[in-house]
């Protein structure tokens, strides 16, 4: 997680919240597992995020699979009970920036 925090640090002011989810956060990953990262930002292009994470991919020797949402889009997906977002929110997370309390719209009830 520290490698990812370091590569995202220059973008931190533009990130509302960022976390690792999936097998890495669950502790069930293998050397071949990718690292799933979800970022909520209102003014970051996917290319900026991808470029930052590519450095971490080289360092870690693992593929990083980023998902990027704007705050309003993330809130709408929570409100609409979007399957992917609901599943991710229910799973363990390793926060790279922010905490559970910083998630837009909070946790679904």
Model-derived segments and spans:
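Catalytic core of pol beta-like nucleotidyltransferases
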Residues: 1-17, 25-32, 41-109
């Amino acid at each position: 997680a520290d490698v990812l925090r370091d590569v995202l640090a220059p973008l931190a002011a533009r990130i509302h919240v960022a976390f690792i989810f999936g097998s890495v956060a669950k502790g069930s990953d293998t050397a071949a597992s990718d690292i799933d990262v979800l970022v909520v930002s209102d003014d970051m292009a996917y290319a900026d995020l991808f470029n930052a994470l590519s450095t971490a991919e080289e360092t870690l020797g693992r593929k990083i699979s980023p998902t990027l949402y704007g705050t309003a889009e993330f809130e709408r997906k929570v409100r609409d009970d979007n399957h992917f977002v609901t599943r991710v929110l229910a799973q363990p997370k390793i926060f790279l920036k922010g905490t559970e309390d910083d998630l837009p719209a909070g946790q679904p009830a």
